[in-house]
From Swiss-Prot:
Family note: Belongs to the bacterial ribosomal protein bL9 family.
Protein's name in the database: Large ribosomal subunit protein bL9
GO biological process, one term: translation
Transmembrane segments annotated in the record for this chain: none
Described purpose of this protein according to its UniProt entry: Binds to the 23S rRNA.
Organism: Xylella fastidiosa (strain Temecula1 / ATCC 700964)
Short name of any one Pfam family annotated for the protein: Ribosomal_L9_N
Key words of the record: Ribonucleoprotein, Ribosomal protein, RNA-binding, rRNA-binding
One Gene Ontology molecular-function label: structural constituent of ribosome
PANTHER family tied to this protein: 50S RIBOSOMAL PROTEIN L9
A Gene Ontology term for the protein's cellular component: ribonucleoprotein complex
InterPro entries according to UniProt: Ribosomal_bL9, Ribosomal_bL9/RNase_H1_N, Ribosomal_bL9_bac/chp, Ribosomal_bL9_C, Ribosomal_bL9_C_sf, Ribosomal_bL9_N, Ribosomal_bL9_N_sf
Length: 149
């Protein structure tokens, strides 16, 4: 299935690229989410006519993501969880907990933007967490996990 991308898609292509994808990926994700349109002559002509509009929208989204990344630069948050005397948490601190903690201190963050490479935290300590705010914008923040008896 050939599609024209209306925005940048990680590991696939950039705005305006004509890509070939498996039919299920195109029908079930790219087309319903408005990320791509079928690569027909009419759609190609319509895309060329609106290309400047799409590029302006992509630039504004990138600028907004960079502004958010600047707010997160050097930010840290403390998350409290029940822990044993050895420092092991009785549960874990995951992406949802981190997103809620940042939102509580006035830095809105969604769970899907938090990247935990090695899974949820199960020990007390300080961790560096990657935030994926846009396809081209990432930021690193510090999360301090404190234990409460």
């Amino acid at each position: 299935m050939e599609l024209i991308l209306l925005q940048k898609v990680a590991n696939l292509g950039a705005l305006g690229d004509k890509v070939t994808v498996k039919p299920g990926y195109g029908r079930n994700f790219l087309l319903p989410n408005g990320v791509a349109v079928p690569a027909t002559e009419a759609n190609l002509a319509a895309f060329q006519a609106k290309r400047a509009e799409y590029e302006a929208k992509a630039k504004s989204e990138l600028d907004q993501a960079q502004a958010r990344a600047a707010k997160f630069e050097g930010a840290s948050v403390t998350v409290s969880a029940h822990a044993s005397t050895e420092g092991k948490l009785y549960g874990s601190v995951g992406a949802r907990d981190i997103a809620e903690a940042f939102t509580a201190v006035g830095l809105p963050l969604e769970k899907k933007e938090v990247i935990l490479g090695e899974g949820a935290f199960r020990l007390i300590g300080e961790y560096d967490v990657l935030l994926h705010l846009h396809a081209d914008v990432e930021s690193t923040v510090k999360v301090i996990v404190q234990g409460v008896p």
